[in-house]
């Protein structure tokens, strides 16, 4: 994930959201006064939600017989939002990846399929390219 330069927005209070396998979370993202504020998530079954303007949807597709699950991210926010996704089994961290925000197309990345839940955290305004890692 890219290190934010002074003046770039960061999420307030280390905001995090959790998503479980086979589910997706849709949440509002507001950028104001140099801060990113996250709205409460709407949890739904995978593939049933689309973000409205100002929202992001993140879904976790189980990996089946592969060692990786797929994270699907669709953004309709005012600016691309980069964030980290951390996979957990109970309280044990097993994987962590950076997701680069894109407004022009959905993003799909891999995370360990054994993750019972995925914590979305360290939100920051991105550049809209695949180089936030």
Give the label of every model feature segment:
Residues 71-79:
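Asparagine-centered strand-capping/turn motif at beta-strand->loop junctions
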Residues 81-94:
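Short acidic, flexible loop segments centered on an aromatic residue
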Residues 109-114:
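Short, hydrophobic beta-strand segments
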Residues 95-108:
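Solvent-exposed serine/threonine-rich low-complexity stretches and specific carbohydrate-binding patches
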């Amino acid at each position: 994930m890219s290190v934010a330069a002074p003046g770039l927005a960061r999420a307030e209070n280390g905001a995090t959201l959790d998503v479980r396998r086979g589910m997706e979370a849709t949440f509002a993202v507001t950028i104001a006064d140099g801060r990113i504020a996250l709205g409460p998530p709407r949890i739904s079954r995978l593939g049933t939600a689309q973000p409205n303007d100002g929202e992001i949807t993140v879904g976790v597709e189980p990996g089946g017989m592969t060692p990786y699950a797929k994270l699907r991210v669709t953004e309709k926010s005012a600016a691309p939002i980069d964030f980290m996704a951390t996979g957990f089994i109970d309280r044990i961290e097993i994987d962590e990846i950076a997701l680069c925000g894109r407004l022009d197309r959905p993003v799909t990345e891999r995370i360990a399929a054994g993750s019972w839940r995925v914590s979305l955290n360290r939100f920051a305004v991105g550049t809209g390219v695949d180089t936030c890692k």
